[in-house]
């Protein structure tokens, strides 16, 4: 579900795969496209994620899965979560580094992904001040809630080059079609497996309420 989409987002932000696909689709000279591709491919070059530093804000179920998967892809993973549960902590790879503050994530990481709930305290937590603390050319991913990011500050960070790419699952007028932003139409749980799991979870919760009175 969401974990796979986050990993895909990192890959799409690292290499201009989307641009390459669009070039192939719109190139009119299909007869010689194989030779043209060799000449044009340089403009779609990027970097590998292996060896890069990934900062994960929020190590709940999804954040922990992203962290573990990223280590298998060769990334150096940093996690920040002052409220991490015991279960989540036990499930984390030992190679994941514990960050004591958000500033550590901002200053050290090439990629940052957010996995926290939207509350009064987290609303627009990624603001102008946060962007100034990040590395130049950082890639920011948001598959949690759109309002976690101050989009006005985000646009400024993109225009200045502070942020290389912003990848999000929440389309709106500010981000849709804007250079430097990759937007998917809320696809996080749009898989056959996720929908089935949601249905099973709903049945279990109803049964727990009827049998035990738990809400």
Give the location of each predicted region.
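Short beta-strand "acidic-cap" motif of Rossmann-like dinucleotide-binding folds
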Residues: 77-79
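Glycine-rich Rossmann-fold phosphate-binding loop(s) that bind the pyrophosphate
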Residues: 52, 59-60
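Rossmann-like adenosine-cofactor binding region
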Residues: 82-174, 190
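N-terminal Rossmann-fold NAD(P) dinucleotide-binding loop
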Residues: 63-64
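Oxidoreductase and adenylate-handling cofactor-binding alpha/beta cores
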Residues: 3-22, 70-75, 201-214
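Phosphate-binding beta-alpha-beta segment of Rossmann-like dinucleotide-binding domains, i.e.
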Residues: 1-53
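Aromatic pocket-lining residues of Rossmann-like dinucleotide-binding sites
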Residues: 69-70, 134
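NAD(P)-dependent dehydrogenase/reductase Rossmann-like domain
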Residues: 176-179, 187-215
């Amino acid at each position: 579900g969401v974990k796979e989409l986050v990993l895909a987002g990192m890959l799409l932000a690292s290499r201009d795969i989307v641009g390459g696909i669009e070039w192939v689709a719109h190139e009119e000279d299909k007869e010689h496209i194989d030779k043209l591709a060799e000449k044009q491919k340089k403009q779609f070059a990027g970097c590998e994620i292996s060896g890069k530093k990934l900062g994960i804000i929020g190590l709940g179920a999804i954040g922990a899965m992203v962290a573990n998967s990223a280590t298998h892809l060769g990334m150096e993973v940093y996690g920040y979560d002052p409220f991490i549960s015991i279960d989540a902590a036990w499930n984390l790879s030992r190679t994941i580094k514990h960050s004591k503050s958000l500033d550590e994530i901002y200053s050290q990481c090439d990629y940052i992904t957010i996995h926290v709930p939207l509350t009064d305290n987290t609303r627009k937590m990624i603001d102008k001040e946060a962007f100034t603390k990040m590395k130049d050319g950082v890639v920011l991913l948001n598959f949690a809630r759109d309002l976690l990011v101050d989009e006005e500050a985000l646009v400024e960070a993109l225009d200045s080059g502070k942020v290389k790419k912003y990848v999000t699952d929440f389309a709106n007028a500010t981000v849709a079609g804007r250079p430097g932003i990759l937007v998917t139409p809320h696809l996080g749980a749009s898989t056959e497996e996720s929908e089935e799991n949601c249905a099973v979870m709903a049945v279990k919760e109803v049964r727990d309420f009827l049998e035990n009175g738990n809400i």
